[in-house]
Structure formats: structure tokens, C-alpha cells
């Protein structure tokens, strides 16, 4: 169960809602990609995502400005610039964490990957996948279409067999995944990055139930679990709205439900061996510590990996 911030606005989400890349939840994928683009273009980058900038700049000039590694749109706001830089650091660290997760899964012999709510994730294009690896990307149809068409237009080709699965995770996504060629008898590496707050609590439980049901022994899953009482996203997006005209209220796009299951505890109860790390500990480990005076504005989350039977890799 998660503590909720009583100042959070009510969710504007509705059953069956959908979006393009610049609308609702789709726009959050652009914000995350902009952070990866800024990190990649900056000095001594922790991760390299050469496709993020293409995906962001193709959306609009305002989104392209957001990806500026110098954060020139915040030149007259030193505090806002420092706080936004910490947000970019967080995105870089979580990307690094999940990149390492996939490296470990591949070393363990897994060749079937499912990215849940893939958004503008470009791992199918940028990671060094062994021959025979298939990457399934599940997300809203228009979001996947935007990514595919944009990268094709720039001549990018996947580094693995990439199979988009256009379906809402609140619907019967296992059927769509199976229809795309997924084989439940093979070990799978699953990823749920930046996803859980955008699902109702019952849909989160169903998601984990289906992931478990579809996972052969030796499968792995990685999950990002947010602290729902953090105001960091709201403040970050407020600056973006005021400075760049990007009208996205992330807090209103998430589900604020006090009875949401604890992901690590749920997985442990259902046969997964879980290892987790506090995002701030991981940021410090990788040389991107959160400054003490910005602690209240920085993201709080848990990054976890879990294994189902078989080798832990």
C-alpha cells in the first residue's frame, strides 16, 4: 500500500481512453525521451540513446527545446534548471538500471523480451541483442505507429526482431501478444518501466497475474515503482507548461489509489525472487546523487528485478 499526497489532483483518466504521442499519457513518453536525448547530448553521458532526439524533435519545436542538454529554456531560473537536471539524472539512472537488467537476462540465455507500455523506448534499436532475440513492444496503437514511422523515416533499423503489439494494457493484451508470436513456453524478460501509476490498482494486479501466467521458469521481470507522494513530477511539468507551452499535467493522468498492491511483495508471494534498490541509492552509486537542498523535489522510486525459478543469470 502506498502513501498518497492529498494535494494531488483527481485523475482525469477514464475507462477506454486512448491517446496519440502528444496527448495524455502519450506526452509523458515524449518527456522521458527528451530527458534521454538531453543526457545523450551532454558531457559524459551515463546512457546513449541516439534515437531519442529524433523522436522528440519530430513531435514539435517545443518538445525539441525540452531536449536541449544546456536547458537554455531555464536560463533565467537557476533553481528550476538544477531541479530539472536532477530529473534528467534520474531518467538516465533508471535507463541504465534497466539496460543492465536486459544485459543480465541475455547472459542468462533469454531471447524473448516484452516491453510493457513501450512508449518511445528505443532499446529494440539501440541495445546489442544476440541473434535470435525477439522484442515485443506493447502500447497504444498511435504511439507505436508514431515511433515506427519516425524511425523508419530516419533510416533506423531494429537490432533485434521487433514486433509491435498495438493494444491497451487494460484490455486482453495476452491474446494480442500471443497472436504476435509470443511463446509462453520460452523464458521471457519483461519490463514495466514508468508504467504502474498509469494503471488502476486492479489493472496492475491483473498485469502481474498475466505476466506470471505467461512466464516460463527462468523468466525475469523488471519494474519501476514510484512513491506516489512525490511532488517532483508535478513541479517539473509545471515548469515545462509555463516555459514551453507543453500542457501536460502528469499528476492528473495517474491513478491515486490507496489500495494499490506493493509490487515487490506481490511478486514475492507469487514465486518470484525479488531484488530491489532505492533510486536514490542507485543515483549515488552511479555518481548522480540528489543534492540535499533538492531532495523534496526529486523523484522517489524503487527499481526492482525478479526471477521466476531457473537461473538468476
From Swiss-Prot:
EC class name: transferase
Coiled coil: none
Superkingdom, taxonomy of origin: Bacteria
Signal peptide (residue range): none
GO annotation, biological process: methylation
Keywords: Methyltransferase, S-adenosyl-L-methionine, Transferase
GO MF term set: methyltransferase activity
Binding of S-adenosyl-L-methionine, residues: 139, 168-169
InterPro entries reported in the protein's UniProt record: Ppm1/Ppm2/Tcmp, SAM-dependent_MTases_sf, SAM_mthyl_Trfase_ML2640-like
EC number annotated for this UniProt entry: 2.1.1.-
Entry similarity comment: Belongs to the UPF0677 family.
Described purpose of this protein according to its UniProt entry: Exhibits S-adenosyl-L-methionine-dependent methyltransferase activity.
Name used for this protein in its record: Putative S-adenosyl-L-methionine-dependent methyltransferase MAP_3563
Organism: Mycolicibacterium paratuberculosis (strain ATCC BAA-968 / K-10) (Mycobacterium paratuberculosis)
